[in-house]
């Protein structure tokens, strides 16, 4: 495994999740049986291009009333599915490898990208504790991850992430802007025409 430094408190752990790829995909399949992917609506009324769902005690949601974490899936009215053990172990291990010990996530946002799907530059500000890092796991098709500064207008580094790569950012880099360029077409032997991203956070 290779560590690639991005900024103070931020790095890419190349291929860190690759050995658990099949188990992670099985976990995602189990989660989506109970909480299928959906395209959420932003407060401005726009439909997000990325399909989303959640697992764990808290789930990130957006609708016309705003962005927030909720213990209940607004589609089913039921609690989000439990976070699979393999998810939690991976997130905790990645955090420790990046120097963030005793990290225990309580939210996992599962994003499914189709060709053309993107995520515009944004900060993660809905969490209660900014001392806890963000863990981002890439599965499936490669993508270009944007890692910017502390203003939306700051120049963003373009970082290619492939199946099994994990990006960790926290500490002085916790509130940096980040996003994903539109996904290019392709086919991955395990994930097909999609890229799936797991984003772990300590939200509550």
Language-model-detected regions and their locations in the chain:
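Non-heme Fe(II) oxygenase metal-center motifs and adjacent flexible, charged/small-residue loops
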Residues: 1-204
């Amino acid at each position: 495994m290779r560590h690639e430094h991005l900024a103070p408190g931020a790095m890419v752990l190349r291929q860190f999740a690759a050995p658990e790829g099949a188990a992670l995909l099985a976990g995602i399949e189990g989660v989506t049986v109970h909480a299928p992917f959906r395209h959420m609506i932003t407060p401005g009324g726009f439909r997000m291009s990325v399909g989303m769902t959640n697992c764990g005690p808290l789930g990130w949601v957006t609708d016309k009333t705003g962005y927030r974490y909720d213990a209940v899936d607004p589609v089913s009215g039921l609690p989000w599915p439990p976070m699979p053990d393999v998810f939690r172990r991976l997130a905790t291990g990645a955090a420790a490898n990046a120097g963030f010990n005793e990290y225990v996530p309580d939210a996992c946002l599962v994003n499914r990208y189709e060709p053309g799907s993107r995520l515009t530059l944004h900060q993660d500000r809905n969490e209660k504790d900014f001392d806890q890092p963000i863990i981002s796991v890439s599965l499936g098709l490669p993508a270009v991850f944007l890692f910017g500064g502390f203003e939306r207008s700051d120049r963003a580094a373009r970082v290619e992430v492939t199946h099994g790569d994990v990006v960790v950012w926290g500490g002085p880099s916790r509130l940096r802007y980040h996003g994903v360029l539109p996904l290019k077409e392709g086919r991955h032997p395990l994930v097909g025409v999609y890229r799936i991203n797991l984003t772990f956070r300590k939200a509550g």
